[in-house]
């Protein structure tokens, strides 16, 4: 289905507004203000600000270079080539190379003028200011990403719960008919969610981090532990009492998967369970010994899983998505 994105709308409105303002100011080459606006509208506020600064700096540098080259050497096509040969590496060195295209337009304006005057330089500065200013104005609006981030969070939490349910079932029954589709799916979800959360950070000029991004980083580390413990779980060939105890623990843990932080409760329960294991009679067979060793290792992995969550300060409950 055909859909017009918010960035397309902002670009169209911004371009028209920049050209209109330039015409009102009776600027020469007024259409170039629209080109500058198009180039400066980016997907995030921080990206737009960085691009605007790079283009403004590059354009100011281009005016200075143009004056030196054209007035001292002459208005000749080969002079433009020589100018760009020196100008482009300098913009790269100064890390304002994003402004090469915009500044090249300004250079061509000055070349076509046939004679650089203070009035014409002021005309170009106004074009640059209008184009960049309108782009920054358009980028003041950025749609909220909260709904998408919450949807990702819920799906990841649901997948964690499914994985834990399968671990619980295996420890209780030894059945292993799970397709495991949630593993690659969760990996993909976490990657996409982190990218989206980073975009959200970039949309807030005065904010360098946010809870959503840290939340998905936390889940990523926890998921690495889940992937690591799965082979250990499936190596257990018999059902033992300790396995049933861990299964009950995992059942309660999966019921409490949420963005808040209650890890300390489960860490205490885990410590108590570890002590209880140590006080139980020694295994009678080799199989039981191997099963209990694997389960003890599983306790250590679950502890790491919970420690990671304990460092996260939590996200307050959000309203239903509806």
From Swiss-Prot:
This is Uncharacterized protein YqjA. The gene is yqjA. It comes from Bacillus subtilis (strain 168). It is a multi-pass membrane protein. It comes from the Bacteria. The chain crosses the membrane at residues 24-44, 68-88, 100-120, 125-145. It is found in: Cell membrane. One of its GO terms (cellular component) is plasma membrane. Keywords: Cell membrane, Membrane, Transmembrane, Transmembrane helix. Its main location: membrane.
